[in-house]
Structure formats: structure tokens, C-alpha cells
UniProtKB/Swiss-Prot annotation:
InterPro entries: UPF0251. Belongs to the UPF0251 family. This is UPF0251 protein Moth_1655. Residues 129-149 are annotated as: Disordered. The lineage of its organism: Bacteria, Bacillati, Bacillota, Clostridia, Moorellales.
Length: 149
């Protein structure tokens, strides 16, 4: 029986969780599911440009585990791009760390004050990502908004 996976720390929940090729009806597409921690690995390494050791530390895993997560994520993204598949970001074994909130409208990120208003300080939008299930204890997650399993 395999060991349960180590809970991964994630600092960011995406505002958009579905990507598909243009001009192809959804019903005709195959789908690739990218776990939240796989997206986090791509964000840390490819978007922020951190070294693998730093990425692993931020996610709370060993460097070899980080490399496996990153390689799995890159393989899924490449499969979707090369073969014209949709990408759905959902699920995984993670907990959200840090109080950062991201505005889904303008992309601004900030650390809200305790008891502060739940709206973007830049554009005033109340459409926020980064609040909700996933903080604290680690759980296996399904789709966003379905809670913890």
C-alpha cells in the first residue's frame, strides 16, 4: 500500500480554472486535469523563475518531489497544447498558505487586513480568489467550491 502524499503548500489559487482551444466546441474536446499543486509548481519555477530548491521549500516538499510535480505538470500542459485538449485546474492534495488574496478582475494581489473589507483595493471588485477551502489542515480537494473531501 503506497504512502499518502505529503500535503503541498500552495500560495495561489487561480482565478481562471479552465482553458480550451478557441473555435472548438467543448463537447468535442478531451480534457487534461492539472492539480492545483502542479499549477503552483509551474508558477513558482516558470513564472517566478525560482530555483528548484527554493520552489521545493515554498511548497514544503523535497527537491525530488518538486521535480516530479513539475514534470507531471509540464507533461500535462504539453499534451494539451500539442494535442488540442482542454485544461481543467482542480483537485490535489494541498493547503493554502498565507493570507494573500487575488482579484479575479484586475489580477492585483494583496494581504488583507484582519476584518478588512472583502473587495479589491485597486478596482473595488468583490470577485476574489484565495479565500475559501484549503487553509489550515491538508485535504484532498475536488473542484473549486465543492469543499474538502
Amino acid at each position: 500500500m503506497p504512502r499518502p502524499p505529503i500535503c503541498r503548500r500552495v500560495e495561489f489559487l487561480p482565478g481562471v480554472t479552465y482553458f480550451k482551444p478557441a473555435a472548438v466546441p467543448l463537447r468535442e474536446l478531451e480534457e487534461v486535469v492539472l492539480a492545483v499543486e502542479e499549477l503552483e509548481a509551474i508558477r513558482l519555477k516558470d513564472k517566478e523563475g525560482l530555483e528548484q530548491e527554493d520552489c521545493a521549500a515554498r511548497m514544503g516538499v523535497s527537491r525530488p518531489t518538486f521535480v516530479r510535480i513539475l514534470n507531471s505538470a509540464r507533461d500535462k500542459v504539453a499534451d494539451a497544447l500539442v494535442n488540442g485538449k482542454a485544461i481543467r485546474v482542480e483537485g490535489g492534495y494541498y493547503h493554502l498558505v498565507g493570507p494573500k488574496v487575488r482579484c479575479r478582475r484586475c489580477g492585483h494581489e494583496w494581504e488583507p487586513e484582519q476584518g478588512g473589507k472583502e473587495a479589491c483595493p485597486r478596482c473595488g471588485s468583490e470577485e476574489l480568489a484565495g479565500r475559501g477551502p484549503g487553509r489550515g489542515r491538508c485535504h484532498r480537494h475536488g473542484r473549486f467550491g465543492e469543499g474538502e473531501h
